[in-house]
Amino acid sequence: MSSQTLVAAGSLEEAIKEALVSSPKKRRFTQSVEMIVTLRDVDVKKPENRLNTVVALPHPAPGKLAKVAVIASGDTALKAKEAGADIVVDKDELQKIGNDKKAAKKLAKRYDFFLAQPDLMPLVGRVLGKYLGPRGKMPQPIPPNVALDALIERFRRSVRIRMKDEPQIACRIGVETQPVEHLAENARAVLAEILKKFPPPNIDRIYFKLTMGRPVKVSREVVRK
């Protein structure tokens, strides 16, 4: 089922507009627009009911692109640098990081997505697994013969949607300066991905809020149970 059949046309836009208008006075920084989806009748204690996936947004926020780290050696590392990866970590550097707990934590915190050369995945797991795993950031293996520049660009414009211990999913869909229509399209992309995992009866409520604003609920009348 698509997000369009779950939520009536225009309802997301209306809730986003209200969230923008009801936010406190202008801040000295550009506030993020966050989407919160609460679920019902989902047992989060069961691993199969948890969600950790990536959604490419149709309209990524200007100046808020995700940071992508590539772990690779040789030709793949060279291509990753040419493709503009935010950082490229080769095998030797990875092993050094493994002996530096502070550096490993910093790497895991600073970058949003990790891509790794397939033959380095076991080493990545041993060296960085305990730092990336709890954050839901374990690397994606780089497919053979992939256009690395396109792959990196896709992750740059993506957000991670993750549900762990609570039946709730929250992610940033943009910033307050973006057009409402763009924010709504981003929200629909996220909702469509959630619906691949959880059918409409499991969708309880949808909210939007700014960083410093109050949550605004999408009208219940348009969320079809």
Swiss-Prot record:
Keywords: Repressor, Ribonucleoprotein, Ribosomal protein, RNA-binding, rRNA-binding, Translation regulation, tRNA-binding
The keyword Coiled coil is annotated on this UniProt entry: no
Molecular function GO labels: rRNA binding; structural constituent of ribosome; tRNA binding
Leader sequence segment: none
Pfam families named in the record: Ribosomal_L1
Gene3D superfamilies named among the record's database cross-references: 3.30.190.20, 3.40.50.790
InterPro entries: Ribosomal_uL1, Ribosomal_uL1-like, Ribosomal_uL1/biogenesis, Ribosomal_uL1_3-a/b-sand, Ribosomal_uL1_arc, Ribosomal_uL1_CS
Subunit field text: Part of the 50S ribosomal subunit.
Function as written in the Swiss-Prot or TrEMBL entry: Binds directly to 23S rRNA. Probably involved in E site tRNA release.
Name of the molecule in the record: Large ribosomal subunit protein uL1
Lineage, top ranks: Archaea, Thermoproteota, Thermoprotei, Thermofilales, Thermofilaceae
Gene, per the UniProt record: rpl1
